[in-house]
A protein has these predicted regions:
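Short glycine-enriched loops at secondary-structure junctions
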Residues: 129-131, 195-197, 252-253
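Noncatalytic carbohydrate-binding groove/subsite architecture in carbohydrate-active enzymes
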Residues: 176, 184-212
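Charged catalytic cores and adjacent phosphate/nucleic-acid-binding surfaces used
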Residues: 2-5, 30-56, 71-75, 137-144, ...
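A metal-dependent hydrolase metal-coordination microenvironment
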Residues: 39-188, 192, 218, 225, ...
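Bacterial N-terminal signal peptides
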Residues: 13-25
Length: 404
């Protein structure tokens, strides 16, 4: 073989290889998501004694409404955060990208995301955001069958690419009709960010006749108490007063990495769902049964009966021991969850190496040296868990029993 022939044949092989790589990259960029997760940013909480603890984000957006990424990117982010379930809930009426993406089928974002997740165990939930002015505000419906039945535009504008004109025409259909259409599909329906300052200028969530009637009639099932970078004590109290499911969401429009910086220790707000199995049906059942805890900026927010089993599963203690020739007891507290637990000791003993406030780091441990004054075979250590809320202003309390 001549040198020129040799060089030519290797060029052909290189071009063929490069072409295959490019075709693969193009196919993946528009097709299924890679099953990638990053242990540093993975959101992990243990199962409780009775249920699987599933990590869920029920409010996100893509370019099919006012988000800025393709639905596949939402799936990729969810895989990196090791979510168990994700809903891409596009605004039905507000379509700011209409000039570029006409979006006649409101199920399209779900279809793309579901296809992208096929090679993974991520559950993609079909959902939409009903978008109105107050008092209805914004409402998410998840576990729907067909998003197209939740919108009706009787008199579309002459220029259908006019975003505001289209939105004005679309919101003429009564919000109650849209909610009832979702309810007819057995959807789980929740009130989004009721403290949003564009509709509640003082930032205080207040119940109104529209939502109270739907809650009373079993048509409103949940309420966001944490959305993006915001949390509302008033919304939390409304959830307790009206027996609504606690929901926490990212409501991400840009990138999770930009908004929440998981590479720097941050995390998106999520809803921890205590389900009987890792299935869409089990998640739906748990949401209707109100078995949730919200994780927001390292704060765990939930009803006492749901938060306590999670704390019990997350925190444990080593056997009790004593330093030689002393009455100084030693015990190690272990944490298998993603939350740093900020504990305030409320018992009668004091510590050798700590004051009354102790942090048990996420997936870490801390060794305590306790001064009980004598050698006992068993000690009870009561704590207030300060990064928890079981009601506005009320923290969970635990007792850790340690024995030799």
């Amino acid at each position: 073989m001549l040198f020129s022939d040799f060089k030519f044949s290797h060029c052909i092989r290189a071009v063929t290889l490069l072409g295959g790589i490019l075709l693969s990259a193009v196919a993946q960029s528009h097709g299924r998501a890679a099953t990638v997760s990053n242990d540093v940013r993975a959101i992990e909480f243990p199962d409780t004694a009775s249920y699987q603890t599933l990590v869920v984000d029920l409010h996100t957006h893509s370019v099919f409404s006012d988000g800025h990424v393709w639905p596949k990117i939402r799936v990729e982010e969810a895989l990196r955060d090791r979510l168990d379930a994700l809903a891409i809930t596009e605004h039905l009426e507000y379509q700011p990208h209409r000039a570029d993406i006409l979006h006649p089928d409101r199920n399209r974002a779900y279809d793309i995301a579901a296809d992208a997740a096929k090679n993974s165990d991520l559950i993609v939930i079909r959902g939409s955001e009903i978008t109105r002015d107050a008092p209805a505000g914004h409402i998410n419906a998840v576990f729907i069958d067909d998003a197209n039945k939740l919108i009706k535009v009787d008199k579309p504008p002459a220029d259908t690419s006019d975003v505001l004109a289209y939105y004005s025409a679309a919101k003429e259909w009564p919000a109650q009709k849209a909610v009832e259409a979702a309810h007819a599909q057995n959807a789980f329906i929740f009130w989004n960010h009721p403290y949003w300052t564009r509709q509640a200028p003082d930032g205080i969530a207040r119940m109104n006749k529209f939502h109270s009637a739907n809650a009373r009639n079993g048509v409103l099932h949940g309420i966001e108490i944490a959305n993006g970078s915001t949390y509302s004590e008033e919304a939390f109290q409304l959830a307790l007063d009206y027996n609504l499911t606690l929901v926490g969401v990212s409501d991400v429009h840009d990138l999770i990495d930009w908004d929440y910086k998981p590479h720097d220790g941050g995390h998106r707000p999520v809803t921890l769902v205590f389900a009987k199995a890792k299935t869409a049906a089990a998640i739906k059942e748990a949401l209707f049964a109100r078995r949730t805890v919200v994780w927001f900026r390292n704060l765990l927010i939930g009803r006492e009966q749901h938060l306590q089993p999670l704390l019990a599963a997350s925190l444990s203690a080593s056997p009790l021991s004593y330093r030689a020739t002393t009455y100084i007891a030693e015990v190690t507290l272990n944490n298998v969850s993603d939350a740093d637990f900020n504990l305030r000791y409320t018992g009668d003993y004091t510590f050798m190496n700590n004051a009354d406030r102790i942090t048990v780091p996420a997936h870490g441990q801390i060794k305590l040296q306790i001064k009980p004054g004598k050698r006992s075979k068993k000690l009870t250590l009561p704590f207030v868990v300060e990064n928890t809320l079981t009601a506005p202003g009320k923290h969970a309390q635990i007792e850790i029993e340690v024995a030799e």
